[in-house]
Amino acid sequence: MIREEFFPTNVYGKDIKLNNHELAQNIFNWSAQDPGVNNTNVKSWHSTTDMASKPEYHPLVDELMIMCKDVFKEEWLDREPVLGNMWANINPKGGSNQPHIHPNSLFSGVYYVKSNPQAGRLRIHDPRPGAQIVMPNRRKGKPPKHLWRDANLDPFPGRIIMFPAWLWHCVEPNQSND
């Protein structure tokens, strides 16, 4: 039998070293001074989208741009990346983000400043609408990735995750007290 894969969806990850304690403190201070905005966030705080322009976040912006360049190279894109909107989310216990995409962007990403295993995983959804038409019964056990309909990515402090902006994703409710 010959098997080939077509139309894969690449999700990229990279672990970086930044002063996450300082980043977290800056974000908490920002949230205390700014009511934020309501987008996909549920029971949580979503900052305005001008985070990249604030000097205290430039070390993170620099790391994001390095990764963006690597992703663009991997994806055969013949252009330089431009960082558009950037914001912070704080999801307290019960906080989450509803399923959404990011229009007018090529890639989107997440950076985890602070997290733990119960803090709410990033869930990405199979982008193929036709794949949802029939959901056959499967054998017992964990099927191979090409048969998954959703993938749950665990949050780790210091991790960047980048994915196509058209990929539907959400954040599960934070079950921790942190």
Which stretches of residues belong to each language-model region?
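Karyopherin-beta/Importin-beta family HEAT-repeat alpha-solenoid scaffold
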Residues: I2-F6, R159, V171
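Active-site region of the double-stranded beta-helix
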Residues: S53-G84, P92-L106, Y111-P117
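Short clusters of hydrophobic/aromatic residues that line enzyme substrate/ligand-binding pockets
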Residues: W45, L122, V171
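Non-heme Fe(II)/2-oxoglutarate
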Residues: M1-D78
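Catalytic core of non-heme Fe(II) oxygenases with the double-stranded beta-helix
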Residues: N89-M162
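Short beta-strand His + acidic residue motifs that chelate non-heme Fe in jelly-roll/DSBH
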Residues: N97-H100, H169-S176
